[in-house]
Amino acid sequence: MSRRAFARTALSGTAALAVGVALPAPRATASPVPLASLPPLPPLDPGALQAAIDDLEHPPSTAAQLRVGGTAGHWRGTSGVADIRTQRPVTAHEKFRVGSITKIFVATVVLQLVAEGRIALDAPVRRVLPGLLPDRFSAVTVAHLLNHTSGLPDHVGIPEPETAEEVFRHRFDHWTPREWVATATNGPLKFAPGTRQEYRGINYVLAALIIDSVTGRPYGEAVAARLLRPLGLAHTVVPGDDPRIHGRHVHGYLAMADGGLRDITVYDQSSVRGEGDMISTTRDLDRMLTALFSGELLPPGLLRLMFTLPPNDVRMLDGSPARYSTGLQRAVVNGVTLWGKTGEKYGYKNAAFSTRDQRRRFVLAYHPTTARDGAESQMIARISDLLTRDNPGAGGSAV
């Protein structure tokens, strides 16, 4: 794998397109999709779903957990082992690193603060976080961070591991949030804020710092007080400076050049604080989606923002339509619109998506051993296809 590919993984903690290998970019819209326009969903096929997660060769993985919910049916399944040393089978209640699914929690808390009048979406970030961003970034607002239209420049001056061995060697490198922000604020803006969209983890590192500033306590404490405890998410944590996963969990592994696997479960998460550092379970993530989509966490006007893409003239840097809203991403699979998020850390990959009306939700967590070689989204593709394709004989795009 190239130096640049490893660096992208270290920077974002999620897939570059965040959803997968075969997803056609959906048409951007400035308003939510009408629920009546949603196509029919297929009945659940337990055998096919189990076969899809049993295929731990595509991509090479050590384990998988799948939880399907919603009014159209429920199913749970597991495959593989949580620990290759002990060969302990994975269960449906294992903790794992959620990667960029963290952003759903952070965006929700920021919007709660907006609802309380403690911050405004159009507030310049420099005003909320004095002295952190240079003067030339004065046009960047809180809203621009949350929907990835900030235009912040690329990181410079950070380690760029070239091999899996180097990734493993640097797994305990530690950064303060302000040190990490400084690596992405040296150059000029890549585009005028609000005019283009580029998925960047640094946007949510800043969003977490905003939560720190507005609430007067670390963002993890705010997430726990506002979301984790009220919703009973007892197995979801913001780890802070602790590189370990406590309690029953799935180990993550990374394939080395000699073909062996190294346990990369214990890993410093300081560079992804607020954008990819949380730990959870499939049950807890399903509960979070249910509460969010049901309107338990936000007033209607702010909840609509999470299902609203930027205007049609705001496009991704590659010219494709925008696909990120405030805290979520949109994917269209076999004509079915899904909202949610993918996440990725070394040894961990997952997806949490739902139709807007919650007829179908799914949380998938699996454990590829490759360092993002372009094929790691194959399991997400299989599952999303099975859960949305009404005609089993038809082809279709996948998340």
Predicted regions and their residues:
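C-terminal segment of classical bacterial N-terminal signal peptides
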Residues: 20-27
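Catalytic loop of the DD-peptidase/beta-lactamase superfamily, centered on the K-T-G motif
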Residues: 30-78, 265-399
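Hydrophobic (often cysteine-bearing) scaffold residues that line and stabilize catalytic clefts
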Residues: 45, 49, 98, 102, ...
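Short active-site loop at a secondary-structure junction
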Residues: 60-62, 86-143, 191-200, 273
